[in-house]
Each structure stands twice: as structure tokens, then as C-alpha cells.
Amino acid sequence: MLAAIDFVQPAIDIIDAGIVLGGRRVRPGDVDLPWVGAVLRRNGVVEETGLAAGVQGDPAIGVAWLARKLAPWGERLQAGEVVLAGSFTRPVPAQRGDAFEADYGPLGRFTFTFT
């Protein structure tokens, strides 16, 4: 399955609004995915931490599951599609003016603000 994935990249799901992609793109074989950690800060305060192993033991498992579920319907994941493997942190409430920093260690750090 990993051979079919060009890269992995951190993402934050803004519930019912979209996603924020950040950090750096990494080939799946170049990082031990279950051990990727995250620290999410809101206005400088740590709100959530997590480990990618919290997504079915390995985020790639969820992507493989999705590919298998689509196949009987004649559907498949297409090149260039963004696939979210699942969150390993809980949602954090946000309001206008809140500034977030997401630190994914070897996959990089990025910031975003609600306006």
C-alpha cells in the first residue's frame, strides 16, 4: 500500500469548513508513520497532543481500508487526491483571532489563524 502513496503531509481538519495542509511532504518509507507525533497549540498554550499510532495503529491502515471499500464499486483513489487518514488529536474549539501552531516533529510545523 505504501508504494502507491507519493507522500504524506500533516493536515488539520477544520470541521465542516475545510482542511489546512502544512509541514513538509515526506515519502511514506522515509518516516515511521505510527510514531509521528503532534503538538497543537492555541494562542501559545498546548491544547492537544497525539501519536499517529492512535489511528488504527498506523495511519496507512485507514487509507488501505478506504481503497478496499471503493474497489467493489469500481471506484479507486485517484492520483492527486487528498486523503485524510484520521485524526489522532481531539477537536479544539476556535474563535475569531485564535492563532494555532501544529508541530508534527519530523514532518514540520505550521501556523494558522482564524479570521
Predicted regions and their residues:
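Short, charged beta-turn/beta-strand-edge "cap" motif at the junction between a beta-strand
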Residues: 88-92, 106-109
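Short amphipathic alpha-helical surface micro-motifs
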Residues: 4, 20-22, 65-66, 83, ...
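Catalytic-core "active-site belt" of small-molecule-metabolizing enzymes
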Residues: 1-56, 99, 109-115
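A conserved acidic, glycine/proline-rich C-terminal tail/linker
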Residues: 59-91
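Short glycine/threonine-rich loop-to-helix capping motif typified by GTGT followed
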Residues: 91-101
